[in-house]
Amino acid sequence: MIRNVLGYWGVLVCALCAEPAVISLPTANQHLFGDEPEKFYMYVNRTFEGETSKPWEGGSFGYVRSPIRVGGKLVMSRFHEGIDIAPVKRDKAGNPLDLVMSISGGRVVHTSPISGRSNYGKYVVVEHDWENSKVYSLYAHLSTVTAKVGDAVNAGSVLGRMGYTGAGLNRTRAHVHLELGLQMSTRYGSWHDHNFGSANYHGNFNGMNIAGVDIAGFFLERRKNPELKFSEFVLSRPMQFKVTVPAGAAEPEFLSRYPWMRRKGVPDHVSWEVGFAATGHVISFTPSKRKVSAPVVSHLRPSDIPQRWLTRGLLTGEGNSASLSAGGKKLVSLVLDSFPIVEAASTR
């Protein structure tokens, strides 16, 4: 027992003492660092309350799309899980020429060269080993994919070329959609087959299994503080809600992948209080003595705006009261691996 505990804390200390990863933007577009967001992000076409516009904000991370009025307040109702980086060079026909490169060292773990198999179009996923944790970057809407699964890459290694493959894009709005995130489960295929009728062509590297963090925010914070670690950035994100879940016989596999998320708690715990950002990614696991038989919302940042607009539909309710929606329950089950094992998980 003592060896196990010391082993756990040894891994945690080692992770927190690890050197910060070397990172760089994935294309020649560096306007994020020049305080020129309108040149960095690809705009979205918007019509709202009779006015049309092309706001660059729609290409940034977070709740930045589909404005609505809720109780007289302007609310962005759609969550964008990555950032859309505009091209800096096009050919005479208007096709983007920008090369798309890995943001950091790692290994190519997935390529999807058939555009019709995902809303991402043609995309690549790179696995990074940061602080003894696996973190994933995703590069979507490519015109061509040159990387191959198993390739070792460095920051700046070419993965493909920018394009406009995928849902709802055209040549004018060509861009690379970039995500940086955490893997929710190593059994995603079973979860997908249990919850959906559609084919999963991407195994554990389906975009639904990668919980995106504010990647532009990470780049900007690292610009100010080159010693900032990814774990420190994630742990600093505002908490929107917490869900208390029954503790199983073993620690959640998610926590074994990201041990730096474990907070101090009570000994002999019977549950975990899992903290979530408004964007739906996990921030913390805290041991708790609260007895619950099923996941229950145990903490909430109050708001007079219905929680579904603030949590991408993971919660229902408003004010100081909320509960998990059907989508929220599915997300929690994915994080906890609490779903049936489907023997014939889809690999089509």
What are these regions (language model features)?
Residues 20-122, 164, 201-347:
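Surface-exposed, glycine-biased beta-strand/turn segments
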Residues 83-85, 124-139:
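Short beta-strand-turn/beta-hairpin segments enriched in glycine/proline and small hydrophobics
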Residues 93-97, 101, 133-156:
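Short histidine-centered loop motifs in beta-beta connectors
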